[in-house]
């Protein structure tokens, strides 16, 4: 996530697994973005060692267009070090490089957009009737002002997801109501592959096939 253009000394921000904030300098942010662009077509697929090497080499070549005087070997080493460190951070281990502490509150003033957007896929009420597959004694979503707002169509949600992506909002939460009541939920999750995606659900309709 890039900082505001007038925040010259602010780092880029990587949101890792939705709960870890990792600051990146400009060169590493460009290198990682180029690698992620090449990784995206493999979403949900097994990546062979040769594919991995090809993606890394392509990301390095693309980054050299910005840093033409930086040796390929140095960029390749930086990419390997960065990815190894990110895996360690994701696993709660000590990374190979020093990573400064960063809180969302401290970084908020440098951001160009929110770090998360909650999307109410399913309304709490339809035509005045309760629209959920449970009737809990307490529901945090019940009685809210917009609880009966008409639901967007699949195409409208996809269009919104694209707008959120262009705005550099890295995380979306599918919520409701009960989002699993929508038959297009898998399609919307697939459309949200670019994001860190969360699902707020009571779990009643979750099956191994749906998961």
PLM segments and residue spans:
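Terminal accessory carbohydrate-recognition/targeting modules of carbohydrate-active enzymes
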Residues: 1, 7, 37-41
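Weak global preference for isoleucine
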Residues: 1, 15, 30, 47, ...
């Amino acid at each position: 996530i890039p900082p505001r253009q007038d925040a010259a000394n602010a780092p880029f921000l990587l949101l890792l697994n939705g709960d870890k904030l990792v600051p990146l300098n400009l060169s590493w942010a460009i290198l990682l973005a180029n690698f992620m662009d090449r990784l995206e077509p493999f979403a949900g697929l097994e990546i062979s060692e040769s594919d991995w090497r090809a993606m890394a080499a392509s990301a390095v070549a693309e980054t050299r267009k910005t840093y033409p005087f930086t040796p390929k070997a140095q960029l390749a080493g930086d990419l390997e070090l960065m990815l190894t460190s990110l895996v360690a951070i994701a696993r709660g281990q000590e990374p190979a490089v020093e990573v400064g502490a960063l809180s969302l509150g401290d970084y908020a003033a440098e951001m160009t957009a929110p770090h998360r957007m909650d999307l109410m896929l399913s309304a709490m009420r339809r035509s005045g009737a309760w629209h959920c597959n449970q009737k809990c004694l307490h529901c945090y979503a019940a009685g809210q002002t917009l609880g009966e707002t008409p639901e967007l169509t699949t195409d409208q949600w996809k269009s919104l997801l694209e707008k959120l992506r262009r705005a550099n909002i890295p995380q979306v939460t599918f919520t409701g109501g009960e989002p699993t009541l929508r038959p297009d939920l898998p399609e919307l999750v697939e459309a949200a592959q670019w994001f860190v995606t969360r699902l707020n659900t009571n779990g009643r309709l979750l099956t191994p096939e749906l998961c």
